[in-house]
Amino acid sequence: MEPVLNLNNEVVKLRKDVKKVKVLIIRKLTRHIAKLKSKKGTEELILKNQRRAQRLLEEIHSVKELKPDDVTKTALRKEISFEKVCKKPNSTAEERALARLATHPLLKQKITAIKEAIKAFKDARKTAAEGEREREKDEPEQVTKIKETKKPVQAKLNKNTEEIKSAKEHVKEEKCKNLLEDSDKGTEKALELPYVQENLPEQTAENKEQPKAQDVERPAVERPAVERPAVERPAVERPAVERPAVERPAVERPAVERPAVERPAVERPAVERPAVERPAVERPAVERPAVERPAVERPAVERPAVERPAVERPAVERPAVERPVVESPAVERPPVESPPKKKACLEQELGCELSDIEDSDKEKEYFDDSTEERFYKHSSSFEDSDSGSDNDFFIGKIRRTKKKKSDKDGSKQKEEKVPPTKEKAQTSEVQKEIPTAKSMKLKSVFCKSLSQTKPKPSFTKRETNFRQERNKRPVMPQASPLAKKPLQSKATSVRQPGRKLEAQPLHPSWEASRKRKEQQAQITKFQGKKIVFDD
């Protein structure tokens, strides 16, 4: 059986193809009309071409109006040929348009395929109907055959029942014969025989299938001996009275023996129960975990490791040392609170301070107050930005080191110890040297303090000079003389950051940004030659 063909679905699928064919035919007809109109010749030919063009135009309008479903249905019903339709004198524009669409090669192939599928579908249905009719004719014959087969089966069953009956009778006859032969031997044997012989027919009745083949053969030979046991059957009734007397004692004997076997079975588990050794072994096993429990004391000793808070406390003590140093530089407190490590750090810092003071004395010649003024005008912009312009390499480097001043406790103490008289002398010397700034010279000076590896070097004095030298490049000559005086006071305050903090505390947001930048700028210090620009 082929799959069920739904014609409506096929018609719907062909709608797109019909629309395509419509477009193609309209284009073809328009081209044909243009050619007919462009042709030249006699007046009769021109009129004839005009009439043909008019007919083609009518066909185009009718093609547009036709529905795709109507085209496919008519093409499936009839065998349309365009030549026959055109030869008809009475053919309308619609008929010609429909013939054009149906005979188009794109549509014609699909319509022929559908027609073939319809034929195959019909043929399959016809063959299926014929096959069903043949089956209906064959069914009554099968029923009759079944009925005929049932009859011999019933005959066989009847024969089997008759054979079973005859076998039972034959067994009874044999019993009677045996009873008569053994009557002389004794009453005891006579009682046992019927008991055994009567059980045989019961077994044969239960297992009908087993004795069928064996018992059917025996009576076929011994059938003529039916008359003899007919007289001796009443002899079977006598032992039937004595059978229950034999059976009763046989049932009582095993009933007495069973409880005798069960009693010793109860005594044995009574001996096995007093197993007192197991709990005795388990009790000392409890003592071992008791020994393991005091081992918990070790983690208890390890937990109070107060090393972490011990590291944090000296970090808190350092800022506490800084505040009293600003008021009065008392050196008695740090040795009491701090361990010997702090003493070594202070000694190193003092050594650094001496070297820095020597460097500052050498650099007094290059101090320029005008550059310092410019530096202070742009100090806010330098502090906000992470790094200065691309040209200001040293400024960025010095600014990062300057930001570390808050962490360095020793550096603040040294700066406070430096007397303000020296700073005033430096500023006066620098002001004298301002007119000689035109003659600029470059020198390379080697500093021992820079070449040495120090744990915490302080570049406070050098920072100001570096920034001043680098800040000479940006041109800011228009600085009012009134603005110079407060800037000079600022310059003195830069050298002593402790005093500046007392005068003007920073905004918390500035402090936070400064701390963040200090963390970012924790890089290795510049260790090498210091470049100095001579005026």
UniProtKB/Swiss-Prot annotation:
Q: Which chain positions lie within coiled-coil regions? A: 5-27, 107-177
User: Pfam families per the record?
Assistant: BUD22
Where does the UniProt annotation place the signal sequence?
none
| Basic and acidic residues bias: start-end ranges | 128-151, 159-191, 205-325, 361-376, 406-432, 460-472
Name the UniProt record assigns to this protein? Serum response factor-binding protein 1
GO cellular component, as recorded: perinuclear region of cytoplasm
Q: Describe the function of this protein.
A: May be involved in regulating transcriptional activation of cardiac genes during the aging process. May play a role in biosynthesis and/or processing of SLC2A4 in adipose cells.
Task: State the compartments where it is located.
Answer: Cytoplasm, Perinuclear region
Q: Where is this region: Disordered?
A: 128-435, 453-535
Assigned keywords, A-Z: Coiled coil, Cytoplasm, Transcription, Transcription regulation
